[in-house]
């Protein structure tokens, strides 16, 4: 409790000390000149001088108040959380706007669905991400239900060397299949299959789907593949993506496997 109070007292003081200070007849000196507007609580605190005894008394009052009203702490934390989320959302909107071309229309990206769709969903994913596996049916359902949906896949291989290897194979496979018809089968089998994804497994899936393996093994180490993955990673960093799956729908970043219904709502809101 003491550690909480050490954090809470400065916050609570802004609210509580202003009326308390006014009641102290021996404490503060009045400002030299009256401000044009009533001073804020923070300004009042800045211009008040309390003795050590007065500070102890005030801290005791605050402590008693917080013990009697612990919901104040929760309210303060909720308000701070809301403020932070609003700031994060505003920053994300600005980042999406400034990276619009690369995010939605890069020449390196994988596009599923309608390339000219009126709504675009971008997904950052990792082939070894359990939550991405869980979210795969959501993507397939959305693509089947909406012929105007453009779905962009961005590689974000952060779950180890196997993920990086799988990403290289996947990007090389996309290079052979600009339409995405074979790629989506590859993507489903690799992401939806059991066991860890790595170079060996990704190549086996690519062979099963019918890609040109000689070309693929050459392409997977090409500058094109490296550039694609680097571009995706830089975008993820700019957007503050720290886990997968993370979606961009319209001007909003949506974190996690939120489910089909919420994705539908986000898509509808962005139309």
Which sequence ranges carry the predicted segments?
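N-terminal targeting signals for export/organelle localization
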Residues: 2-101
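Surface-exposed, polar/charged faces of alpha-helical domains
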Residues: 60, 64-75, 79-82, 86, ...
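Structural alpha/beta surface segment adjacent to cysteine/selenocysteine redox centers
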Residues: 122, 133-207, 237-242
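The canonical Cys-X-X-Cys-His
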Residues: 129-133, 245-248
């Amino acid at each position: 409790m003491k550690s909480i109070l050490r954090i809470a007292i400065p916050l609570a003081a802004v609210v509580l000390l202003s009326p308390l200070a006014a009641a102290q007849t021996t404490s503060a000196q009045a400002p030299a000149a009256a401000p044009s507007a009533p001073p804020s609580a923070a300004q009042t605190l800045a211009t008040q001088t309390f003795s050590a005894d007065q500070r102890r008394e005030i801290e005791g009052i605050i402590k008693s108040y917080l013990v009697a009203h612990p919901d104040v702490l929760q309210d303060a934390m909720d308000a701070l959380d809301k403020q932070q989320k609003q700031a994060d959302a505003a920053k994300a909107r600005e980042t999406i706007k400034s990276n619009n071309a690369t995010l939605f229309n890069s020449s390196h990206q994988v596009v599923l669905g309608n390339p000219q769709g009126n709504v675009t969903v971008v997904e950052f994913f990792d082939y070894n991400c359990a939550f991405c596996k869980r979210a795969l049916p959501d993507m397939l359902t959305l693509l089947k239900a909406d012929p105007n949906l453009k779905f962009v896949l961005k590689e974000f291989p952060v779950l180890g060397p196997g993920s990086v290897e799988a990403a290289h194979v996947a990007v090389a496979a996309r290079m052979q299949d600009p339409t995405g018809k074979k790629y989506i089968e590859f993507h489903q089998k690799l992401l939806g299959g059991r066991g860890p994804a790595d170079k060996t497994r990704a190549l086996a899936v690519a062979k099963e789907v019918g890609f040109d393996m000689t070309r693929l093994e050459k392409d997977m180490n090409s500058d094109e593949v490296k550039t694609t993955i680097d571009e995706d990673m830089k975008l993820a960093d700019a957007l503050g993506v720290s886990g997968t799956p993370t979606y961009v729908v319209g001007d909003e970043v949506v974190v996690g496997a939120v489910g089909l219904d919420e994705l539908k709502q986000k898509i509808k809101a962005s139309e």
